[in-house]
From Swiss-Prot:
Official protein name in the record: Phosphate transport system permease protein PstA
Biological function: Part of the binding-protein-dependent transport system for phosphate; probably responsible for the translocation of the substrate across the membrane.
Cleavable signal peptide: none
Species whose genome carries this gene: Mycobacterium leprae (strain TN)
Alphabetical keyword list: Cell membrane, Membrane, Phosphate transport, Transmembrane, Transmembrane helix, Transport
């Protein structure tokens, strides 16, 4: 090969300019998608602005986070949502304690062990459960736990209903994360003679843990604002109740529903303050899950 040919600069190739018709189509499509984005964004911004404007005064009071409504008259704007915030967190955490092991083990079976028609049936049932309304889950727990077994209305009954709502989210998120673990790692363990169960416990689960925890936090954020279970399965209390198996227990959705019937201006402030508190709580859980996933992924990348 002649070296002069290699040293010779490459001639610029003049591409055919984009036609006016294609430019118009591209601009129209861009404007269409941008307009759709704005249409979807306007209700969200409107909702947040209204809730923040009407609930900001309530949440900026120190008593709002440290006191309950025990002894507070309906027309008196005093006390706070400490009891309702505690109830929402306890009900969601108890539900997560039951739903996470069951959902994670179900996902492990579907990914690592399952095959045949039983897996398809299980997957179909998980999809059906994901579409079940919260009121149906609440009525099922009411019929089983209260009407049939004879237990009283309590926060634990609410947690049982929340388990039904959390399970499909935990199963699906864990299943997707487990499928992202490279099969080469499993095959390397099998080649070394490591049993399958030990491969799952020692290799697959540690790698998938950040994603699983993020999915769990998303499922908690998904159910912590559900209203139907608390309306059906537990009564409202203006003071804090530490017993999840007996007595009424307040929660943020139940407080909002109860204070809606209060005609006083104090009830108006409590409704919007509780709504803003619930938004802050859900946003905080989502941000914590995103930050945890980012830090865990960054640490794993640095270890390579």
């Amino acid at each position: 090969m002649n070296l002069d040919t290699l040293d010779r600069p490459v001639k610029a190739v003049v591409l055919r300019p984009i036609s006016v018709r294609r430019r118009i189509k591209n601009n129209v499509a861009t404007m269409f998608f941008f307009t759709s984005f704005l249409i979807a964004l306007v209700p969200l911004v409107w909702l947040l602005s209204v809730v923040v404007a009407r609930g900001f005064y309530a949440v900026t009071r120190f008593d709002w986070w440290t006191h309950s409504l025990r002894g507070v008259m309906p027309e008196e704007f005093a006390g706070g949502v400490y009891h309702a915030l505690y109830g929402s967190l306890v009900q969601a955490v108890v539900a997560a304690i039951m739903a996470v092991p069951l959902g994670s083990m179900t996902a492990v079976y579907l990914v690592e062990y399952g095959s045949g028609p039983f897996v398809r049936v299980t997957t179909f049932m998980v999809d059906v459960l994901a579409g079940v309304p919260s009121i149906v889950a609440a009525l099922f727990i009411f019929c089983l736990w209260i009407a049939t077994l004879g237990f009283q209305q309590s926060a634990f009954a609410v947690s049982l209903a929340l388990v039904l709502l959390m399970l499909p989210v935990v199963v699906r998120s864990t299943e997707e994360i487990l499928r992202l673990v490279p099969d080469e790692l499993r095959e390397a363990c099998y080649a070394l003679g490591i049993p399958k169960w030990k491969t799952i416990v020692r290799i697959v689960f540690p790698i998938a843990t950040p994603g699983i925890i993020s999915g769990v936090l998303l499922s908690i954020a998904r159910v912590i604002g559900e209203t139907a279970p608390v309306l059906v399965l537990v009564g409202y209390s203006r003071s804090i109740n530490f017993d999840i198996f007996d007595g009424n227990m307040a929660s943020l959705p139940l407080l909002i529903y109860t204070e809606l019937t209060n005609p006083e201006y104090a009830g108006f402030l409590r409704v919007w303050g509780a709504a803003l508190t619930l938004i802050i709580l859900v946003a905080g859980i989502n941000l914590f899950g995103a930050a945890f996933r980012f830090l865990a992924t960054r640490r794993c990348s640095g270890c390579r």
